[in-house]
């Protein structure tokens, strides 16, 4: 089956044909690093990491770029509130981001460009737009002349006139038209800034991604992706900037993941109902959170609650049990061949079902259903009096194959010594801070992994329990 994906630009599923055969250039909008990421930030990280993994599974060479916005209004506000420098805060939360998404099974992008490290390219991009008549300077600010770009609105499927009716010029803005948007902001007093032809300032949000995508991936890319909330105005404005500058299509396919609701309400900071990944993975297996995110098609909204996550944990546990039973039975299996072709055919059918699911716009929900079907077949097979080693190996291999694409593992994780030492140090720190709930949670976590702790006057000792 041919891989098809839903393109927001055309509002339909299309066969995937990359610009260059066998290669995929992919850009995913990353976070603004002023705090720990919430589960709304985690969803695109997980979803598009899975898209990347499946493209690689199909044999494509994927060049994957995802940025960090490490200077903007939110970071400046956080810096003022905390009495710290913007780069210090950005660095702290970039480190935290890698820790969080790493625990969720996300592979690092080939490149994670930062706005502050690409300022020359951003300034050059803006100057070229001015030279071409698509932008103008006004008292140190630079604005994009939206009506000058003929295709504006093609991603969000809105006409300029429709957009104009809701547009307003805010106090302090010097734009000529309410539809125009900021490319460069003149610096305020005591605010982080960079020199430019228009005076000291910093870039607007939209220009950053256009400039960095072009620098690291070229004028035209295959896939541009992000959350549904970015389609307008962010991605719409990226198209206007990039295509005005190059005269070429910016991205062939636009992918957007759906919203996350918390207990059936849309997640928002105004409602105070956002949940940090940092907090969830203190109490829940990060793999379960990833499994939960992929259990719904990426374009559909997903409802999060602790109860639903617990249900997911139980479902994930059933798969781990089936996998564990296969590994255990492997030790007593023989070279039996009678009836094995029938079981091998069933396994191959499940492989094809997985590929069919993923070829249909990366339908991870259906792919996970295939895992449960595979587990059901495995459980039936294990009821046989005699089992063949190569059949069990085939079951295990397909489980591993599917899970490697979906980004989790059914294997029991054995902690490395350094990981154990790090957990013990976190527990000791919690005890020093009289955070006994965290201390007990880490002890229980280690106990579940067969690690036995002994607290002594000289410190905490540990050993692995008997298998």
Swiss-Prot record:
Cofactor(s) required, per the database record: Zn(2+)
Q: Where is this motif: 'KMSKS' region?
A: 266-270
- The reaction(s) this protein catalyses: tRNA(Cys) + L-cysteine + ATP = L-cysteinyl-tRNA(Cys) + AMP + diphosphate
Report the locations given in the UniProt record. Cytoplasm
- Relay the cofactor remark from the entry: Binds 1 zinc ion per subunit.
Q: Report the residues modified as Phosphoserine.
A: 270
Q: Name one GO biological process term.
A: cysteinyl-tRNA aminoacylation
Motif extent ('HIGH' region)? 31-41
Q: Where does ATP bind?
A: 269
**Endpoints of the signal sequence:** none
Record Pfam families:
CysS_C, DALR_2, tRNA-synt_1e
Binding residue positions for Zn(2+): 29, 209, 234, 238
Q: What is its EC number?
A: 6.1.1.16
Q: From the Swiss-Prot or TrEMBL record, what is one GO molecular function term?
A: zinc ion binding
Entry's transmembrane regions? none
Per the record, GO CC terms?
A: cytosol
Q: Which family does it belong to?
A: Belongs to the class-I aminoacyl-tRNA synthetase family.
Subunit-level organization: Monomer.
Annotated protein name in UniProt:
Cysteine--tRNA ligase
What phylogenetic lineage does the species belong to? Bacteria, Bacillati, Bacillota, Bacilli, Bacillales
- Gene name, Swiss-Prot/TrEMBL: cysS
């Amino acid at each position: 089956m041919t891989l098809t994906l839903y393109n927001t630009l055309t509002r339909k599923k299309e066969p995937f044909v990359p610009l260059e055969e066998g290669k995929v250039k992919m850009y995913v909008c990353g976070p603004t690093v002023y705090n720990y990421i919430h589960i709304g930030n985690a969803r695109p990280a997980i979803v598009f990491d899975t898209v990347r993994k499946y493209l690689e599974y199909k044999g494509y060479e994927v060049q994957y770029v995802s940025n960090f916005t490490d200077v903007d209004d939110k970071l400046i506000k956080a810096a003022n509130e905390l009495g710290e420098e913007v780069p210090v805060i950005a660095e702290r939360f970039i480190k935290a981001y890698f820790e969080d998404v790493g625990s969720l099974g996300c592979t690092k992008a080939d490149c994670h460009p930062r706005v502050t490290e690409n300022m020359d390219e951003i300034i050059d991009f803006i100057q070229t737009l001015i030279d071409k008549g698509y932008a103008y300077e006004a008292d140190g600010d630079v604005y994009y002349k939206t009506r000058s770009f003929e295709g504006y609105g093609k991603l969000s499927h809105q006409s300029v006139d429709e957009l104009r009716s809701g547009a307003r010029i805010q106090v302090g803005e010097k734009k000529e038209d309410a539809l125009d948007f900021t490319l460069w902001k003149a610096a305020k007093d005591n605010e982080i800034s960079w020199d430019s032809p228009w005076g000291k300032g910093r870039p607007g949000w939209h220009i950053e991604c256009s400039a960095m995508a072009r620098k690291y991936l070229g004028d035209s890319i295959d896939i541009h992706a992000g959350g549904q909330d970015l389609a307008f105005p962010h991605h719409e404005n990226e198209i206007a900037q990039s295509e005005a500058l190059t005269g070429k299509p910016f991205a062939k396919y636009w992918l957007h993941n759906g919203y996350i609701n918390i207990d059936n309400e849309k997640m928002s900071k105004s409602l105070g109902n956002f949940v940090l990944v940092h907090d969830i993975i203190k109490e829940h297996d990060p793999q379960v959170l990833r499994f939960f995110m992929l259990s719904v098609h990426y374009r559909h909204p997903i409802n999060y609650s602790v109860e639903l996550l617990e249900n997911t944990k139980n479902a994930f546990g059933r798969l781990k049990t089936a996998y564990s039973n296969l590994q255990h039975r492997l030790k007593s299996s023989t070279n039996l061949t009678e009836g094995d072709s029938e079981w091998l055919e069933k396994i191959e059918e499940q492989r094809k079902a997985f590929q069919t699911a993923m070829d249909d716009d990366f339908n991870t929900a259906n792919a996970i259903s295939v895992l449960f079907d595979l587990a059901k077949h495995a459980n039936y097979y294990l009821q046989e009096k005699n089992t063949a080693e190569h059949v069990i190996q085939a079951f295990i291999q397909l489980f591993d194959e599917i899970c490697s694409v979906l980004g989790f593992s059914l294997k029991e994780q054995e902690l490395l010594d350094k990981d154990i030492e790090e957990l013990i140090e976190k527990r000791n720190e919690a005890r020093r801070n009289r955070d006994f709930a965290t201390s007990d949670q880490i002890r229980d976590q280690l106990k579940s992994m067969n690690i036995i702790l002994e607290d002594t006057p000289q410190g905490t000792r540990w050993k692995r329990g008997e298998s």
